[in-house]
């Protein structure tokens, strides 16, 4: 192999490495954004669950009345 062939191969490898670094950084940013969204959604679910428990606790007990169709 000639020096030119080696240089071409090294250039190709450097371009691949650069592309992979950019792709990894982009994917890292996407994952970070998604984790922030997941965290916010988990907090919302917990808050809604707490509100539901509070609403159920505040609801009066059902009366022992027959249904309206009787």
Curated annotation (Swiss-Prot):
Parts forming coiled coils: none
Cited Pfam families: SlyX
The family this protein is said to belong to: Belongs to the SlyX family.
Annotated protein name in UniProt: Protein SlyX homolog
Species this chain originates from: Nitrobacter winogradskyi (strain ATCC 25391 / DSM 10237 / CIP 104748 / NCIMB 11846 / Nb-255)
């Amino acid at each position: 192999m000639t020096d030119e062939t080696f240089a071409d191969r090294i250039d190709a490898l450097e371009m691949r490495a650069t592309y992979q670094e950019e792709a990894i950084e982009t994917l890292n940013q996407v994952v970070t954004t998604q984790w922030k969204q997941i965290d916010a959604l988990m907090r919302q679910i917990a808050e809604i669950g707490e509100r539901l428990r509070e609403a159920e606790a505040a609801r009066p007990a059902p009366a022992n009345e027959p249904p309206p169709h009787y």
